[in-house]
């Protein structure tokens, strides 16, 4: 029922229309008694209408006003924010001990506040702390690189350098001897899944140093996963076409 989505405190409502203007789904309009929803199924549960109301007159059953937590701490100054973002560095030399469950949970809890297209969210995370599994993943990536070298792809020369370090010198420049790997995943049919995952991880890795953790983006592992996924897609299309 479209009448059940919004609750308007008519004594507070200014009828300024800012909630209507800011609704990303364009499903609100201004009526005689305040904002009205024209199509509740179009609501993406972003809570923008509730958050933007200057007098707290609007409630949304998907994002209840009573469950909102105001930010009480002072915001960082522009100078502090600039220096915080500027100091971001990848860590490529990790301590042997893996982060605790609590530390990982705190980091990924922050990640869920990252913007996602259409407020789609729907992120999944796989956390791996088993050393043998991490080594097996790095080995699988090295095997993929060897196949790329044999095929003479555009990355051949670069991968040869990586493989010499990994295979001959025993230098793990694929997983960096990290005690923990975290994979950010989205549903395959989510066309913005990759960008959602990248933005979520950006939040996580910016937060990590505040609890004493270091992070890096495992680009070789990511590239291997993307390449293998594309190979499977092409293979599936070919099988479909010729079967």
Regions found by a protein language model. Give the residues of each.
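Conserved small/polar residues in nucleotide/adenosyl-binding loops
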Residues: 231-238
């Amino acid at each position: 029922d479209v009448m059940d989505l919004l609750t308007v405190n008519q004594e507070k409502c200014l009828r300024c229309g800012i909630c209507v203007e800011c609704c990303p789904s364009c499903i609100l309009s201004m009526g005689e008694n305040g904002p009205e929803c024209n199509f509740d199924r179009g609501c993406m549960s972003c809570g923008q209408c509730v958050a933007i109301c200057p007098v707290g007159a609007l409630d949304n059953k998907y994002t209840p006003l009573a469950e909102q937590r105001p930010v009480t701490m002072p915001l960082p100054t522009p100078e502090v924010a600039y220096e915080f973002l500027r100091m971001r560095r990848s860590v490529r030399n990790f301590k042997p001990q893996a982060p605790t469950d609590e530390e990982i949970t705190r980091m990924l809890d922050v990640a869920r506040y990252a913007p996602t297209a259409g407020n789609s969210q729907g992120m999944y995370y796989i956390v791996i702390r088993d050393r043998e599994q991490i080594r097996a993943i790095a080995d699988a990536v090295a095997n993929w690189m060897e196949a790329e070298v044999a095929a003479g792809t555009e990355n051949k020369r670069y991968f040869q350098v990586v493989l010499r370090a990994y295979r001959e010198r025993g230098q793990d420049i694929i997983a960096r001897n990290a005690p923990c790997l975290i994979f950010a995943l989205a549903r395959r049919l989510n066309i913005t899944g990759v960008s959602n995952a990248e933005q979520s991880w950006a939040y996580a890795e910016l937060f990590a140093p505040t609890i004493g953790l270091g992070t890096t983006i495992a680009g070789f592992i990511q590239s291997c996963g993307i390449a293998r996924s594309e190979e499977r897609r092409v293979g599936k299309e070919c099988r479909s076409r010729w079967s």
